[in-house]
Amino acid sequence: IGSFIINPR
């Protein structure tokens, strides 16, 4: 959550 750009999982 909040890191979808970095971790799209």
Swiss-Prot record:
Protein's name according to its UniProt entry: Unknown protein 6
Species name: Zinnia elegans (Garden zinnia)
